[in-house]
Amino acid sequence: PTLSDQEIVRRVQCGERELFGELHTRHYEKVLNYVLRSIWQRETAQDVAGEAWIRALGAIDRFEVREDTSVVGWILRIAANLITDYRRRLGPETQSFEDETDFGAPQFIV
C-alpha cells in the first residue's frame, strides 16, 4: 500500500529520513512548476525549488502532522518565501519588469 504524505512525514520525523525522497519524487514537478510561474529562468527556478526541498527536510521535525494538513502546501509555502527572497535580491528595477511583463496581454507604457 502507498503511504500518505502525512504518514511519510511521521516516519521521517521518527528517523526514516530516506523516505523523504518519496515526497520529493511525488511532488518535485509540482513545486518546480509553481516556482516557474514566478521565475522564468528554468535553471534559477530549479535552484529555488531545490532549496525549498532542502529547507523542508531541515524543518520537517517542526511540521505538525494532521490529516487535514497538506504536506505539499507546506513545501509550496516554503517555495513562495524563497521566491520573495529571490525577488528582493534582484532589486526593484528587475522585479518590476518581471511583475509587469505578461506576454499574453498587451502592455502600455505611459
Residue ranges of model-derived segments:
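Conserved RNAP core-binding helix
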Residues: 8, 24, 32, 42-59
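A short, charge-rich alpha-helical start-of-domain segment used by transcription regulators
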Residues: 9-33
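Arg/Lys-rich amphipathic alpha helix in sigma70-family domain 2
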Residues: 58-66, 76-98
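Structural recognition of an alpha-helix C-terminal capping motif at a helix-to-coil junction
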Residues: 47-54, 69-81
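Hydrophobic alpha-helical core bundles mediating ligand binding, dimerization, or RNAP-core interactions
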Residues: 5-6, 24, 28, 53, ...
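Short, structured helix-loop boundary elements
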Residues: 6-9, 17-21, 42, 68-76
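Internal acidic/polar
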Residues: 1-2, 93-110
